[in-house]
Regions:
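Short catalytic-loop micro-motif centered on adjacent basic/acidic residues
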Residues: 22-25, 86
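Mobile "lid/hinge" segments at catalytic clefts and subdomain interfaces of large enzymes
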Residues: 19-22, 146
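Internal gly/pro-rich beta-alpha loop/helix module
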Residues: 1-18, 29-30, 34-40
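Short, basic, glycine/proline-bearing loop/turn elements
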Residues: 21-23, 114-115
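Thiamine diphosphate
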Residues: 1-8, 41-195
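Short beta->alpha connector loops at strand-helix junctions that form conserved
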Residues: 25-28, 164
Length: 195
């Protein structure tokens, strides 16, 4: 199936490095509608919509308003926030599935959908703190692309799940699994953080 030329891991980082560019990676149909609205209403910023070819479910908690702020809590912790998983695009669903498994193990996480880093960075400090509070330093980012740019959100104590090597030739599901983008691997990484 798809080989390395269809796995452009550097493209998100390259697009995000363009001044004033908004790179939006929606995770489902609700986020896509919000992203489209932002793109057509934008008069100052060029916008790149990064979409998946995968079938993705509409997620409970998806928010048009959240997308307009660049990032938002799509999966709130039950009681206390042991860790935060930050994801974009189709990986948000992966993060939500991992949240369910982690809760079974007694680990209570928050899931943040971050479709647009640039818009989130423009929010006021209070909003950013409400989504990514400073006192929760156990953070994991999940994006099937270069790690470039994610360290500022996870900090020195966090883990970045990314792809920092050339792609592979195989059916999509095999490639995804070989790079570790599975519920089990997300759970394992969160467990490393909270120990």
């Amino acid at each position: 199936e798809d080989g390395p030329t269809h796995q452009p891991i550097e493209q998100f980082a390259m697009l995000r490095s363009i001044p004033n560019m908004h790179v939006i990676r929606p995770g489902d149909a609700v986020e896509m509608a919000a992203a489209w609205k932002l793109a057509i209403e934008s008069k100052e910023n060029p916008t790149a919509l990064i979409l998946t070819r995968q079938n993705v479910e509409t997620m409970a908690g998806s928010s048009v308003e959240g997308v307009s702020k660049g990032a938002y809590i799509i999966g709130k912790e039950e009681k206390q926030c042991d860790a935060i998983i930050i994801a974009s695009g189709s990986e948000v669903n992966l993060a939500m599935n991992a949240k369910t498994e982690l809760l079974k193990k007694g680990i209570d996480v928050r899931v943040v959908s971050m479709p647009c880093q640039e818009i989130f960075d423009q929010q006021d400090k209070a909003y950013k703190q409400s989504v990514l509070p400073n006192d929760v330093r156990k953070r994991l980012s999940v994006e099937m692309a270069s790690s470039f740019g994610w360290h500022k959100y996870v900090g020195l104590d966090g883990i970045v799940m990314s792809i920092d090597e050339f792609g592979r030739s195989a059916p999509a599901n095999q490639v995804i699994e070989s790079f570790g983008f599975t519920v089990d691997k997300v759970v394992e990484n969160v467990e490393k953080l909270v120990k």
